[in-house]
């Protein structure tokens, strides 16, 4: 026990949240070919759908910090998981472009919040010696969440529609949310409000700006691969849709293996020394 919360339970909740982030990153790209076929979308309409995912993620990434500091981690983690699940259900049931766009913004918003929120939560409950390896282990669950969608769609799409498969995944996600609800989380760090002046002062940190610059391109490349790979395979090559999903799974598997490798490396090597080799 620690200050009224159980560290392992909180870490488990963070891992569930990271699984949801993995789902949010990969779902649209996995079902996009099926949506295009189902709704007979034009190229412009397809692009308009994909554009709304990073918009939601950017918004979520910007707002999570002040809210978590003021109201605590639980105030964001559980609602964000619900938002992602609701957006997923929107992809199943909505056939209107505006409603689909709202669903995709929701998936992105919840995912963007969960990405930062879960990392911050694990950082707060971890000691300095275990922080790097714990955050890397958390990242493995991003891979598990992201692997599940294209894998299940690729395997089961010959027997079930993508709507049925997503409904089954939604039930599992709902169980994860119900698990997180009764867990006690750490108290808010800034219960009196967010120090705006200190936050703006971070913009002067050159190392932070450099890492943000690197992450900008990395996340952009990852987003393009996640959202457009299956459509590209279907339109430009002769690769069947289910095999395109398997190809997408391979990329996510590579990310997951890298996260597992980080767990070992960060126990022996400083993260700053690993970064140049990753680039």
What are these regions (language model features)?
Residues 1-5, 187-211:
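Juxtamembrane intracellular "pre-TM" segments in multi-pass secondary transporters
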Residues 26, 54-58, 62, 147, ...:
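Residue-level signature of mid-helix packing/kink "hotspots" within the transmembrane helices
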Residues 28-29, 206-249:
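Extracytoplasmic gate region of multi-pass secondary transporters
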Residues 40, 72, 93-98, 238:
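Helix-breaking motifs and short loop linkers at transmembrane-helix boundaries and internal kinks
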Residues 59-95:
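Conserved MFS/SLC helix-loop-helix module at the cytosolic interface between two early adjacent transmembrane helices
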Residues 87, 98-106:
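Paired small-residue
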Residues 99, 137-184:
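Helix-loop-helix hairpin linking two adjacent transmembrane segments in secondary transporters
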Residues 104-140:
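Cytoplasmic helix-loop-helix junction between adjacent transmembrane helices
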